[in-house]
Amino acid sequence: MFQNNPLLAQLKQQIEANKEYVEGKVKASDKNFGFLEADKKSYFIPPLEMKKVMHGDNVKAVIKREGDKESVEIDSLIDPMLDRFIARVRFNKDGKLQLAVDHPQIRLNIPATTHKKVTEQLANDDWVVAQLKSHPLRDDRFFFAQVTEFICKADDHFAPWWVTLARHQQPRESVKTEQSYTLQDQSPREDLSHLYFTTIDSPSTQDMDDALFIEPITENAIQQGWRLVVAIADPTAYIAEDSNIEHAARQRCFTNYLPGFNIPMLPRELSDDLCSLVPNKKRPALVVYIETDLNGNLIKDASFHTAWVESKAKLAYDNVSDYLEGVEQAWQPDCAELKQQIYWLHQFTQARIQWRSKNALLFKEQMDYNFELNADGSVKSIQIQYHRIANQIIEEAMIIANICCAQFLAKHAKTGIFNSHAGFDPKNYEAVQTFLLNTLATDENRSELTDLFSPTQLATLDGYCAMRRYIEDFPEKFLELRLRRYLTFAEFKAEVAPHFGLGISHYATWTSPIRKYGDIVNHRLIKQVLLNQPIKHIESTILARLQEARRQNRLVERDIADWLYARYLLPIATQGVEFDCEITDISRGGIRAKVLENGAQIFIPCSTLHENKDEIDFIPEEIALYTKGEKIYQIGQATRVKLTDVRLETRSVLGNIIK
């Protein structure tokens, strides 16, 4: 009697019309309830409704009200949190396979089967890749998954590496080697093997792709400037453009440098041997001649050539730095030619640093942290690596070589893989101006700074550089750290565009073709120009893949480091150890602080910062916390933190700020 009843249909429409829907993301709690985080509001999800969803699901829900209390009833799934995911194997008491998702907020064990291609015998706590096959809101059944890939056994000491690489879908093996390698590029090359080229790198480096030779330019026995010859390894001499190696490099895009080892972009026979500029071996290279005056100004167009070169010495950063800095009992050059090359390179570097300080932008000094590992992958120690004068020698040589490459490609090829950075995101111009004026302006200089920091000025390379130079000597770190949040991301482009971060109008890397696929592409373009061949324009898919691969590699580096820090600090987690730290981030949930002596990130929950959590106000514009109108913590602030807990399963390190 109710079938096709118009009154019933009308009633259903009225009920539906009266429903109040909301969309948002599910946030799980430590209990069996959760919250739906919608725009500027949070709704309670009762335990029964939470069984339909998991943390991170994007859902549509109906708002329910009982008195002054609001909750939601889940209606439908918009996007699931999980698709492909990392998990640990769990077998329940009946021996049924379940998967514990490797995510700090997802605590349910998902029933699963194993794909037939997975042949390993699974055991508790093994690491696997899985695919979510069913979702209660999408498939009218319970959560269910399938193991699609075995990662490693539970007791594998290198699990942090293998799991992280699998999470970000990065290869863990080198590119498959060929039976033999022959020189594909048979075009004539200059023989520069008589020049005293040297490399400066870390002692353990095998994939050396740059070597330097320098000499003064003189006129009537008076020095007028410098002639720098930069020789770059030429893997394109061995790699055909349509080869399997080329396709693999195009997918990988970069050599992955991980704690303890690297995963090369090219087969190791090429990256560490045939193409590497090892001492006393003749190697094919792409070479640029660069001429500057004594102040570091380029005085003529750079000249590119294919050549044969032979490195005469492999030098180490610390040895060269110790020598130049006059450290007692430091390493010494073993011949007059080497001593002369180091001296001249040092003089050239000083001139280029001065040039960049006036005409471009210099990098802010930052410490790097290196993990020293035991054979089993455990962390033996963490060393601070400082940016010393030998590092600057290579840095300045590579920067000027990359500037010359960009100018050459822009002029002759009209395309290339250019490194660009547009400075601040345009939507942030006014916020940047307001922030800088609030921080720096006085009654006397407000008018001047309003013009200096205006959106029209910040949008130009010259205006951005002027702003950077003005704030260079500001003593507090929060200014620099806050400005970083307003920046846009660096991009790869097929047409020349300025790099605001460097303060340079033309920039294209070609100096690391063993390690970067974009540099291989630029090598091929340079050769096409030199040989008067047709220029191949850059495919947008290459730029997109470079961008994505760079992002993936950074995530891999971060995730492995987080895991190793957790392992390293776990044995002392309950010993009340205190560290000098710098606040690197602040949110409503708490503070993140970097340990200065080892680089670890410690999270300090907001609940530990003040006796009354409700009195704490987070001001996102300042990245600061206030209580009763008084600023108590700000990004960049120095503080002391006591280590309180390390949770290895979530790779999280917790602490309390010492008042």
From Swiss-Prot:
Name of the protein in question: Exoribonuclease 2
SMART domains: CSP (SM00357), RNB (SM00955)
GO biological process: mRNA catabolic process
Function: Involved in mRNA degradation. Hydrolyzes single-stranded polyribonucleotides processively in the 3' to 5' direction.
One cellular component (GO) term of this entry: cytosol
UniProt-listed HAMAP family: RNase_II
Top EC group: hydrolase
Every S1 motif domain range: 576-658
Residue ranges constituting the RNB domain according to the UniProt record: 189-530
Pfam families in UniProt: OB_RNB, RNB, S1
Entry EC no(s): 3.1.13.1
One example GO MF annotation: exoribonuclease II activity
Keyword Hydrolase: yes
Keywords, sorted A to Z: Cytoplasm, Exonuclease, Hydrolase, Nuclease, RNA-binding
InterPro entries for this protein: CSD, NA-bd_OB-fold, RNase_B_OB_dom, RNase_II, RNase_II/R, RNase_II/R_CS, RNase_II/RNase_R, RNR_Ribonuclease
Encoding gene, per UniProt annotation: rnb
PANTHER family per the UniProt record, alphabetical: EXORIBONUCLEASE 2 (PTHR23355:SF37), RIBONUCLEASE (PTHR23355)
Localization in the cell: Cytoplasm
Record family assignment: Belongs to the RNR ribonuclease family. RNase II subfamily.
Domain of life: Bacteria
Catalytic reaction(s) noted: Exonucleolytic cleavage in the 3'- to 5'-direction to yield nucleoside 5'-phosphates
